[in-house]
Amino acid sequence: MIAKTTNLNLFYGKKQALFDINMQIEQNKITALIGASGCGKSTFLRCFNRMNDKIAKIDGLVEIKGKDVKNQDVVALRKNVGMVFQQPNVFVKSIYENISYAPKLHGMIKNKDEEEALVVDCLQKVGLFEEVKDKLKQNALALSGGQQQRLCIARALAIKPKLLLLDEPTSALDPISSGVIEELLKELSHNLSMIMVTHNMQQGKRVADYTAFFHLGELIEFGESKEFFENPKQEKTKAYLSGAFG
């Protein structure tokens, strides 16, 4: 187990957005969060790196590697908990600098050789190196949308996170680019724990080891993806998977 939440409740002012969420996130597995828009998926995801701190009141416990995230320095926390957003958000810097910036900031690189090796390694992990090896000094904004999103994943990997959060990482991409990202995530999960929000149920079925269904801020059902999709236990889950609402 890499992380867990215990009796997690979240409030935006007087409105409660999450209700008593209890969940365990397994090590080196992909956990998908599904549910209709506004059900609390992204809100839940952002509890792990404290991105809700300034806008919400949070009760309950969120732990990563047995440590309460509330008691951790937020910069140190976000080094260990990477995040990839819905829209690619590359830095307005070179492809090379997009990878090297954060490791240098955190003092993880001792010399130029280490820096270059890290950049190459991260780009290779996301299958991007061969596509960009001759243009590492070019602005990352020149890349296609799919390439930019893979660069964002490589950038997140550069600081060696324990947990990677992905908020609909393929929703802004074409089907081919989405497929590339899905295969990449499955490969990365051999050595990395991930939580992924997705509106695409079939994507969750293809990619995730575990799936959680949220409805109106409540965790309705959670389990191994094969069993979850083939034999859902809760009536609301069955209705959602059948397309009765969403």
UniProtKB/Swiss-Prot annotation:
Cellular component, GO annotation: plasma membrane
Membrane-related topology note: Peripheral membrane protein
Localization in the cell: Cell inner membrane
Any GO MF annotation of the entry: ATP binding
Coiled coil is among the record's keywords: no
Domain ABC transporter: 3-241
Keyword annotations of the record: ATP-binding, Cell inner membrane, Cell membrane, Membrane, Nucleotide-binding, Phosphate transport, Translocase, Transport
Keyword hit for Cell inner membrane: yes
Reactions accelerated catalytically: phosphate(out) + ATP + H2O = ADP + 2 phosphate(in) + H(+)
GO terms, biological process: phosphate ion transmembrane transport
InterPro entries per record: AAA+_ATPase, ABC_transporter-like_ATP-bd, ABC_transporter-like_CS, P-loop_NTPase, PstB-like
Entry EC no(s): 7.3.2.1
Group of enzyme by EC: translocase
Sites where the protein binds ATP: G35, A36, S37, G38, C39, G40, K41, S42
Gene3D superfamilies xrefs: P-loop containing nucleotide triphosphate hydrolases
Role noted for this protein: Part of the ABC transporter complex PstSACB involved in phosphate import. Responsible for energy coupling to the transport system.
Entry's family note: Belongs to the ABC transporter superfamily. Phosphate importer (TC 3.A.1.7) family.
Assembly notes: The complex is composed of two ATP-binding proteins (PstB), two transmembrane proteins (PstC and PstA) and a solute-binding protein (PstS).
Name of the protein described by the UniProt record: Phosphate import ATP-binding protein PstB
Species whose genome carries this gene: Campylobacter jejuni subsp. jejuni serotype O:2 (strain ATCC 700819 / NCTC 11168)
Gene for this chain: pstB
